[in-house]
Regions:
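Regulatory and interdomain segments flanking nucleotide-handling catalytic cores
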Residues: 1-218
Length: 218
């Protein structure tokens, strides 16, 4: 079973020119990361601040959703370091509106940049139908497990609402299975600092949700 992500950046038009440049760079970086890290997965930026991702194995989906949210929320750190002002508070709190779908892709061709099929139609349609204060939607063709999948994704979405930009950086690395020592070295903080960030985020709940989801049968 495959999956797709359709997303757009919340209130990106509130960003100054310098902020938009940073945002575009971070989106391109994420697409490169996705292509290199997850076999058969790829993504593209559409309509300036829109995102479409084709996921070759639905088991990757929850981890990729978390990584994408972290990538966007961590932008605040770059803004502070570069002294970039402006931006709507909803951009910094939520970062990205996202609709995901678990289903079939008739065509998933990274080389030709073609994704086509029911899954991308479903996620794209769901994103277009979202209201101003809706930030997440999920649909699944695997009806037997849909209630469990919905619960796991909604739990993760709720947790991510209160994760700070700096915590998002830590979580992004932890989701790549880096050790606390390695994260501490990259962040320039102590191992205890990493531990406290992860505890505040709710890493135990996130890692349990990931294990549960990645063991599901699709």
């Amino acid at each position: 079973m495959e999956a797709t992500i359709s997303a757009d950046i919340i209130r990106s038009t509130s960003l100054p020119k310098e902020g938009m440049i940073v945002l575009q760079e971070r989106l391109r970086d994420f697409m490169d990361f996705l292509n290199k890290t997850f076999d058969g997965c790829w993504g593209r930026v559409v309509r300036g601040d829109g995102i479409e991702c084709a996921i070759s194995d639905a088991h990757y989906l929850l981890r990729i959703v978390l990584l994408l949210k972290c990538q966007i929320k961590a932008i605040r750190v770059c803004f502070d370091e570069m002294n970039i002002k402006g931006g709507d508070k909803r951009f910094f709190k939520f970062g990205v509106r996202m609709a995901v779908a678990i289903g079939r892709l008739r065509t998933n061709d990274k080389e030709q940049a073609i994704m086509d099929g029911e899954a991308i139609y479903n996620s794209g349609r769901a994103l277009d139908q979202m209201g101003s204060y809706d930030f997440f939607s999920i649909s699944s063709d695997y009806k037997e497990s849909e209630p469990i999948v919905q619960s796991l994704f909604l739990l993760i979405n709720h947790i991510m609402k209160r994760v700070s930009a700096r915590q998002s950086q830590v979580l992004f690395m932890k989701l790549q299975n880096m050790s606390d020592v390695e994260i501490a070295q990259r962040m320039g903080i102590t191992r205890v600092g990493v531990y406290l960030h992860l505890k505040s985020i709710g890493w135990d709940a996130i890692s349990t949700a990931l294990r549960c989801y990645e063991m599901m049968k699709f």
